[in-house]
A protein has these predicted regions:
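Non-catalytic structural scaffold of enzyme domains
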Residues: 2-284
């Protein structure tokens, strides 16, 4: 079902991975690196397997059936790697696939929407959410926020251009600023006091967004809060790693060289990247 090829480097260091079960983290691309950085910060002893489904990027324009199929294939692969827990470092898959796949796998699977919603209601009463088209259409954040705190107001904006611009490393492109202005304008008009990054890619745009928003608007990064929830789950299940972690393993379904180049900017080092073909990940 799966085959792989290696892009530069020696993966012998991963041979002991099964003796030290890892946390699996996946996203459509580099967005989930915001979650990975939080794991490094909050859970420095944990070994991690990161999967970027770059062959199917971006998820935000995909149908629910496509997302569900891709997520199942990724989780099957992670199951073969004997992970102890998985974080869906992707709001779109969290919104459209989490509840389905939680019933299908025997390891804990955490999504980013609920931790983000919980954090948002602690920050303000007029909450804006910027998200991919699929996440915005799902109303996942609005529903989660309203269930927690019914008296808040929520506005969502679909931002289809953000993920491609981030994946192309065009953060500081003047065009990106113009796009961001157009997405934020309706939220600023509503006088939001809180903005939720409804996509794990979006914290990469923090300098751009912060410069465009009123200073009183608080930014909520769900990656911070899903990793805090992960820490609680590890403690609850008594499965925290207390030894030194294994090197982070990176795998992608698309071009490993491109991901490695992006990783240098977001991680501060060039990761060794493995290409994995999820051959069953097709939807007719």
């Amino acid at each position: 079902m799966y085959s792989s090829s290696i892009f530069e480097g020696n993966f012998d260091d991963f041979s002991d991975q099964n003796s030290q079960p890892a946390i699996g983290v996946f996203d459509s691309g580099v967005g989930g690196l915001t979650v990975l950085r939080q794991i490094y910060k909050q859970l420095p002893n944990e070994s991690i397997i990161y999967f970027g489904d770059t062959a199917h990027l971006p998820y935000g324009i995909r149908s629910q059936a496509e997302i569900l199929q891709y997520v199942r294939e990724i989780l099957k692969w992670m199951q073969q790697q004997r992970v102890k827990m998985v974080i869906m470092a992707c709001n779109t898959s969290s919104a459209l696939a989490l509840e389905n796949v939680r019933q299908e796998f025997d390891f804990p699977i955490l999504g980013v929407v609920l931790p983000g919603a919980r954090a948002a209601v602690q920050q303000g009463k007029r909450i804006g959410v910027i998200a991919t088209p699929a996440t915005a259409k799902s109303n996942a954040y609005r529903q989660a926020i309203m269930e927690i705190q019914p008296d808040v107001e929520v506005w969502q904006v679909s931002c289809p251009e953000f993920v491609p611009l981030i994946e192309q490393n065009r953060i500081h492109d003047p065009y990106t600023t113009e796009v961001a202005k157009s997405y934020l304008e309706p939220l600023i008009k509503q006088e939001i006091d809180t903005l939720v990054y409804g996509c794990t890619h979006y914290p990469h745009l923090a300098p751009v967004l912060r410069a465009l928003l009123p200073s009183y608007v608080k930014l909520v990064d769900p990656s911070v809060h899903v990793v805090a929830a992960c820490a609680q789950e590890l403690d609850l299940l008594s499965i925290r790693n207390t030894r030194l972690p294994m090197p982070t393993r990176f795998a992608v379904s698309g071009c490993p060289q491109q991901f490695a180049q992006s990783g240098l900017q977001w991680l501060g080092y060039t990761p060794l990247v493995e290409q994995v073909y999820l051959t069953d990940a097709t939807v007719s």
